[in-house]
Design a protein with these regions (language model features):
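Peripheral, non-AAA+ core regions of ATP-driven protein-machinery
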Residues: 2-249, 256-259, 297, 362, ...
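Alpha-helical scaffold elements adjacent to nucleotide-binding pockets in ATP/GTP-utilizing enzyme cores
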Residues: 77, 81, 114, 153-157, ...
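Conserved alpha-helical scaffold flanking the Walker A/P-loop in AAA+ ATPase domains
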Residues: 239, 312-333
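Walker B catalytic acidic pair
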Residues: 337-338
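Inter-Walker segment of RecA-like/P-loop motor cores
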Residues: 295-313
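Walker A/P-loop
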Residues: 250-289
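Basic, amphipathic alpha-helical bundle interface domains used for macromolecular binding and assembly
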Residues: 67-75, 90, 97-107, 320-321, ...
Length: 543
């Protein structure tokens, strides 16, 4: 794609009207100038050409180009900010166009680019200084440059468009500088912008070393698996789930440690690689949730929305959609506590992201795609009061328990690979006799399992055992005659569906990886059968 800022063909010459204007004896304005900025769609940025034209006519500031209301308001912000910076607008007709006009633009990120284009038309800065630039930022009425979301995505768009330099708010400069191929310069007010465009050589490039930021990442020592007493089977199930990025459901009474285990799962996942960290940072930046002063997110996300969360908050939404909890948990954990208490609409919206690992939101202006590469961890009580099947404590009638369990649909349960009962702890388990295994020790095994899967799926779409296609499952889960016979007996005894059969094989493959076995053995299958999620009919039959 040609660079809109550096084209010098016949079309460019047609717009250079300063010679015609000077022949009339009224020097002072170039009339037309342009600069690149960027809009946000989904989690990616796209180039927007900001054009400014000054002409004779009634004094007004007109903005066109399929604009949201906050973009149209940029005219008033720019006019006032320029006046307060000592550059009042002339009493002429000023038209600003944001192209392409077929795409709706929203947000206040275009203010700084509009101001730069207008300044060039007024000859306050050299028009050629805007060539090869991408500019974005919000203006206050005093001329201060305010921070904006999505600067990392903007820098990526600049790199893709061949732009070598970006001017962004100072508070966002370190974030944009993560893209090493683009020179990112921060400005704090309009005066700095004018000085920089008059003397480009004075711009100070913002320097950030992403690797050093990752190197400073530290685990959360306050949440370690060594603090969890008892629940050895649930802890083992959590390790298997983390090793293959399998969706994981824990069922047990209140106080059995389900939430404690869930919050410690990020600590046994491998540290983020730079590519993963950049993807997560871009999502949080677009959502406006990047922590102040942080250029790069170095820890895996752990999102735990309340059960009153709506479907829109989970998936993302708005007239111009922004990422929801599902996308914000990409690369990490989405923890849904009290799973049956969530609205049915919120639970059902999980089905597509769990299957396709993306969220698609359709609006009149287009379809927005957000990443959903997360591991679902959920916890629930076995009944409304929480103590079923302990009839000495459970106060629920059988019909109430059946209704409570029936809130989860079978299609949703089909997408959960591992289900584990978390029983009430005994006094001896609570006392914690002996030393429990630490998160660091478990993480070493999980990292080795991830390494094995990386080698296995090199060049393939899948990255983890949980994401294997049916063909890959049959290819990589090699079975001997005894293993095949065991699977046949399990298939007949439990009336497994085809989906449940392949899910069982994927979990068995992960267990084999943890033990560094090339083939899936009988013991791996038996352990995977112990993690088999209940069919909804089985739950209701037990009541």
């Amino acid at each position: 794609m040609s660079n809109l800022c550096t084209d010098t063909g016949p079309e460019e010459k047609k717009y250079k009207r300063e010679e015609i204007y000077r022949r009339d004896g009224r020097e002072g304005f170039i009339l037309f100038s342009k600069v690149l900025s960027a809009g946000i769609g989904g989690v990616d940025a796209y180039p927007v050409r900001v054009e400014a034209d000054v002409s004779e006519g009634l004094p007004q500031f007109l903005m066109v180009g399929y604009l949201a209301s906050e973009v149209k308001e940029a005219g008033d912000r720019v006019r006032t900010a320029l006046r307060n910076a000592g550059c009042p607008l002339p009493a002429r007709r000023i038209t600003v166009n944001l192209a392409p006009a077929s795409v709706r633009k929203a947000g206040s990120r275009f203010d700084l680019a509009v101001a730069a284009a207008v300044l060039a038309s007024m000859q306050k800065i050299p028009a050629e200084s805007l060539g090869g630039l991408m500019i974005a930022g919000e203006l206050s009425l005093s001329g201060q440059v305010l921070g904006i979301p999505g600067v990392l995505a903007l820098a990526e768009a600049a790199r893709a468009a061949g732009v070598k330099r970006c001017i962004v708010p100072s508070v966002n400069a370190r974030e944009g500088a993560l893209i090493q191929e683009v020179e990112v310069v921060g400005v704090s007010d309009l005066t700095e912008l004018i000085e920089l465009l008059r003397h480009p050589e004075k711009g100070v490039r913002t320097s950030v070393s992403p690797d050093s930021l990752l190197g400073r990442s530290e685990g959360n020592e306050a949440e370690d698996f060594s603090q969890i007493h008892g629940q050895k089977m649930v802890r083992r199930a959590a390790e298997v789930a983390a090793a293959g990025m399998h969706n994981f459901l824990m069922i047990g009474p209140p106080g059995s440690g389900k939430t404690m285990i869930a919050r410690r799962i990020p600590g046994i996942l491998p540290p983020l690689k730079l590519e993963e960290s950049l993807k997560i940072t871009k999502i949080y930046s677009v959502a406006g949730l990047l922590p102040p002063g942080e250029a790069l997110i170095t820890k895996r996300p752990f999102r735990a929305p309340h059960h009153t969360t709506t479907a829109e908050a989970l998936a993302g939404g708005g007239r111009l959609p922004i990422p929801g909890e599902i996308s914000l948990s990409s690369g990490g954990i989405l923890f849904l506590d009290e799973l049956p208490e969530f609205r049915r609409s919120a639970l059902e919206i999980l089905r597509q992201p769990l299957e396709e690992h993306r969220v698609c939101i359709s609006r009149t202006a287009g379809t927005y795609v957000f990443p959903a590469d997360f591991m679902l961890v959920a916890a629930m009580n076995p009944c409304a009061c929480g103590y079923y099947p302990d009839r000495s404590r459970c106060t629920c009638a059988p019909r109430e328990t059946a209704r409570y369990l029936g809130r989860l649909s079978q299609p949703l349960l089909d997408r959960i690979d591992i289900c584990m009962q978390a029983p009430r702890l005994s006094y001896g388990e609570l006392q914690g006799e002996g030393e429990n295994e630490s998160s660091a020790s478990i993480r070493r095994r999980v990292e080795e399992a991830h390494r094995i899967q990386k080698e296995r799926f090199r060049g393939a779409p899948a990255r983890f055992n949980s994401r294997m296609s049916v063909r890959d499952t049959e290819r990589f889960c090699c079975l001997g005659q005894r293993e095949k016979q065991l699977l046949k007996e399990a298939f007949d005894r439990f009336s497994l569906s085809a989906r449940a059969y392949h899910r069982l094989l994927r979990v068995a493959r992960t267990i084999a990886d943890l033990e560094q076995e090339d083939r899936v053995r009988e013991g791996h299958i038996l352990e995977a059968l112990g993690y088999r999620p209940y069919e909804r009919s089985e739950w209701l039959r037990e009541v």
